[in-house]
Swiss-Prot record:
Cystine crosslinks: 99-191
SUPFAM superfamilies: Family A G protein-coupled receptor-like
Lineage: Eukaryota, Metazoa, Chordata, Craniata, Vertebrata
Keywords assigned by UniProt, alphabetized: Cell membrane, Disulfide bond, G-protein coupled receptor, Glycoprotein, Membrane, Olfaction, Receptor, Sensory transduction, Transducer, Transmembrane, Transmembrane helix
Membrane topology label: Multi-pass membrane protein
GO CC annotation: plasma membrane
Annotated glycosylation sites: 5
Stated family: Belongs to the G-protein coupled receptor 1 family.
Function of the molecule: Odorant receptor.
Stated name of the protein: Olfactory receptor 52N4
Recorded GO MF terms: G protein-coupled receptor activity; olfactory receptor activity
Length: 321
């Protein structure tokens, strides 16, 4: 009788097929993807440079924005370059271990994106509800600790994805109808029981996004109460304006995330696979692309710094708000 070792059921590599059903148009799809990726790289690197270089931006709000920019850079860079290689050069192979690494980085930093947005909501809550204590509550050590905790939360919750995926037997081929290695997309190629993978994936989603959304909702509920109680219309308008960019970032992040998550689990037979794959990529591209634009347009301090640098002002380091 022929017996198979466990290693015989683990493929050496997967073949990423890109966007299923749209193979003939993938070259055209690559242009908006590439454009968004370039904007994301330039915008987020520019924000990181500004926050590091400008003394005026050495404040808690901008430290959290730097965390968001770094997270966005890693999040989109973990998938989009490979997707462009698939679209342009038909380089579809990805090693099994390389696939697990991509899976780890993608899911870890999407979780961290949500965590940083939650921290930014808490930052706005402290700034509006406790303005006199803002700098004493959100000190540099506190910011470093909560940022590290958010990163470790993602790492510790996502590491089991790689082990659960590696333990599965794969006897349904190695062709993956996707542009990157998503946890459940890879697990569905297995001929084993993926119930544990599905349940754990749902638990992680609830622990990360459920907790973060609850904190964001509570923060903005208290912000709304504080703002409404202000006697001056100008003060209310100014307080709301400080939250506009963050609210836009939340919308850009959570809208495609929820669509991708629920369509993958509950709308598989309703929503075309091509639509799901495109949204899954937009989910990783839209926040990194739009966040620098929104914060650049809505935040006066960042606009002023950019204008002074572009105008060649030599007094950028000494400028204070």
């Amino acid at each position: 009788m022929l017996t198979l070792n466990k290693t015989d059921l683990i493929p050496a590599s997967f073949i990423l097929n890109g966007v299923p059903g749209l193979e003939d148009t993938q070259l055209w799809i690559s242009f908006p993807f590439c454009s968004m990726y370039v904007v994301a790289m330039v915008g987020n690197c520019g924000l990181l440079y500004l926050i590091h270089y400008e003394d005026a931006l050495h404040k808690p709000m901008y430290y959290f924005l730097a965390m968001l920019s770094f997270t966005d850079l890693v999040m989109c860079s973990s998938t989009i370059p490979k997707a462009l290689c698939i679209f342009w050069f038909h380089l579809k192979d990805i090693g099994f271990d390389e696939c697990l690494v991509q899976m780890f980085f993608t899911h870890t930093f999407t979780g961290m994106e949500s965590g940083v947005l939650m921290l930014m909501a808490l930052d706005r809550y402290v700034a509006i509800c406790y303005p006199l204590r803002y700098s004493t509550i959100l000190t540099n050590p506190v910011i470093a600790k909560v940022g590290t905790a958010t990163f470790l939360r993602g790492v510790l919750l996502i590491i089991p994805f790689t082990f659960l995926t590696k333990l599965l037997p794969y006897c349904r081929g190695n062709i993956l109808p996707h542009t990157y290695c998503d946890h459940m997309s890879v697990a569905k190629l297995s001929c084993g029981n993926v119930k544990v993978n599905a349940i754990y994936g749902l638990m992680v989603a609830l622990l990360i996004w459920g907790f973060d959304i609850l904190c964001i909702t509570n923060s903005y509920t208290m912000i709304l109460r504080a703002v409404v109680s202000l006697s001056s219309a100008d003060a209310r308008q100014k307080a709301f304006n400080t939250c506009t960019a963050h609210i836009c970032a939340i919308v850009f992040s959570y809208t495609p995330a929820f669509f991708s998550f629920f369509s993958h689990r509950f709308g598989e037979h309703i929503i075309p696979p091509s639509c799901h794959i495109i949204v899954a990529n937009i989910y990783l591209l839209l926040p990194p692309t739009m966040n620098p634009i929104v914060y650049g347009v809505k935040t006066k301090q960042i606009r002023d710094c950019v204008i002074r640098i572009l105008s060649g002002s030599k007094d950028t380091k000494s400028y204070s708000m």
